[in-house]
Amino acid sequence: MNVPKHVAIILDGNGRWAKAKGMPRNYGHAQGSKNVERICKEAWRMGIKYLTVYAFSTENWNRPDDEVNALMKLLRNYMKTCLKTAAKNDMKVRVIGDVTRLDEDIQKRILELEEATKNNGGLNFQIAINYGSRDEMIRAIRKIAKDCVDGKVDPAEIKEETFEQYLDTKGIPDPDLMIRTSGELRLSNYLLWQLAYTEFYFTDVPWPDFSKEELEKAIETYNHRDRRYGGVKEEEEQNV
């Protein structure tokens, strides 16, 4: 089986999953957080080298205050458990997004987590927190503009590779496969630049129920995709 090098996931459906069980939305987020750890282990076991998950978007601040506060509390706790998981499984953890809006204690925990795992050689695990792709690109453009004014960058020499050096995902290969759970068929401002040639897989399964078998099913579907990157294969050219 051809295993994608980089898988990106939109972790959707936690709240609806909890509501269907007669539980509060926060319960769903907590269970979804636990499932992230399980899928990280399975991804590495399958041979996936990079896993990026959409944990909290720039638009999620618009949710009710009690839900946002619960998510921030969950995030604080997750930073602790993730450090233990990373140490146990040799994971390298990196947070993408504008963390400056997060409380200082969360920012500190993120820095500690990244520093403690930076030399690990296992799964490269990226967590998108306060992330929005449009916001990411605007921040990148502002940095490039400043460097142009400062004479560090020649505007005429800016290429795709130049722009990518200013993105949160600098140094990380573009995803090969993007998975979205819980039946929604949109990208929700997630990795818009990086997903240019990524294969998409949508499933009705909510994130807390997304299992090893579901991940295997997504990869099996990926194996039946014909990735052309805008071109055509040799046999197709011969048949034109």
Regions found by a protein language model. Give the residues of each.
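Flexible, compositionally biased loop and terminal segments
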Residues: 1-240
